């Protein structure tokens, strides 16, 4: 009987600390944070990513730990932060949205400049120390050209990646094998997807599809990803891309093709509007999102106050009194 009671207590604790998606949320609180990219939560801490930084807060939003890329006056790294901080040698300069699971922080890393990403990888950090642990290598054969967000599918032991440049697909890798698993087509496309999160078999997608210049709100969408099958990479032939939306041609105007490993297939997903973010203090650039496993609150990070061109801040809206970009986490309580 004693063992049964302990087992029931453990199960109850697990259920109490598992995220569940609601259908209606109400703004409860706004917290200014030092990072502009991503937000994640476990039962003890909140985690915020900046382009070149990681921050950890307790559940009262007191900063308890941080790691920021720093250099000395000669440009030598004091703390490189990234496993490989040299873009010239295949390194990264950019964190996107993040997730935390089983004591590890999952980050999407790349070298990002004016709307294009290269040198992509999923780099995993220890949530206790904020130190690098290992990487999951990117497979460009999947078709992915940028990584804006990372989300762990806790039920299927997968990690999913979003693509800001070409948001038609989201891509999955196995946490067990560290290999490419499958991709899902987002229909209709939530363009400029900045962050994702998975709960109850549903993917939430934060899309920077508004327009800060015109005060048009960004949106959060949802998509059922249950049943996405393994497709992997297979041997095949496909056109060579010139850009994500065009193909290369030879001197005779014929499409250039390549033979080798290509994506073995995909599942079609159905994207629905989950929430229009009209209650942001100002339309800006939506970023990462997550659900607090303790409270079931929805947390969404938004940047405001600067004009955004191709995913990069181009200076403040001085005519509105802004002198810098402001990063805020919007906390929404679940109504039902």
Q: For the regions a protein language model found, what residue spans apply to each?
A:
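Structural motif
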Residues: 53-58, 114-123, 167-172, 212-228, ...
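Beta-strand-rich domains and repeat architectures in extracellular enzymes and scaffolds
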Residues: 26-55, 94
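Surface-exposed loop and turn segments in beta-propeller and other repeat-based domains
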Residues: 20-28, 64-91, 132-146, 183-189, ...
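Hydrophobic, aromatic-enriched interface-forming segments
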Residues: 144-200
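Short loop/turn segments immediately following the C-termini of beta-strands
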Residues: 51, 110-112, 162-166, 208-211, ...
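Sec-dependent N-terminal signal peptides
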Residues: 3-13
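Short coil/turn segments that connect the beta-strands within blades of beta-propeller domains
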Residues: 43-44, 102-103, 155-157, 200-202, ...
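Repeated scaffold domains used in trafficking and secretory/extracellular systems
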Residues: 33-40, 75-79, 89-99, 142-152, ...
């Amino acid at each position: 009987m004693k063992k049964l009671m302990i087992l029931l207590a453990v199960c109850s604790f697990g259920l109490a600390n598992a995220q569940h998606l609601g259908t209606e949320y109400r703004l409860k609180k706004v917290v200014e944070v030092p990072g502009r990219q991503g937000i994640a939560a476990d039962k003890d801490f909140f985690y915020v990513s900046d382009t070149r930084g990681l921050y950890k807060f307790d559940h009262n939003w007191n900063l308890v730990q941080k790691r920021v890329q720093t250099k000395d006056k000669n440009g030598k790294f004091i703390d490189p932060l990234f496993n490989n901080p040299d873009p010239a040698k295949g390194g990264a300069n950019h964190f996107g949205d993040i997730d935390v699971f089983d004591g590890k922080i999952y980050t999407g890393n790349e070298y990002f400049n004016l709307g294009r990403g290269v040198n992509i990888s999923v780099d995993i950090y220890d949530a206790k120390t904020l130190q690098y642990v290992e990487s999951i290598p990117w497979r460009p054969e999947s078709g992915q050209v940028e990584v804006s967000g990372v989300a762990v599918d806790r039920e299927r032991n997968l990690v999913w990646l979003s693509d800001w440049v070409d948001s038609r697909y989201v891509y999955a890798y196995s946490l067990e094998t560290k290999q490419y698993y499958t991709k899902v087509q987002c229909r209709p496309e939530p363009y400029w997807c900045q962050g994702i999160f998975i709960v109850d078999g549903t993917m939430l997608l934060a899309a920077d599809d508004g327009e800060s210049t015109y005060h048009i709100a960004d949106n959060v969408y949802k998509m059922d990803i249950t049943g996405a099958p393994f497709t992997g990479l297979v041997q095949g032939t496909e056109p060579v891309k010139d850009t994500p939306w065009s193909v290369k041609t030879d001197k005779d105007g014929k499409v250039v093709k390549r033979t080798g490993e290509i994506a073995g297939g995909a599942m079609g997903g159905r994207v629905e509007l989950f929430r229009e973010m009209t209650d942001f203090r100002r339309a800006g650039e939506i970023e990462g999102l997550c659900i607090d496993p303790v409270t079931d609150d929805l947390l969404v990070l938004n940047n405001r106050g600067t004009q955004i061109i191709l995913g990069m801040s181009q200076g403040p809206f001085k005519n509105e009194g802004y002198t810098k970009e402001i990063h805020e986490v919007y906390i929404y309580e679940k109504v039902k």
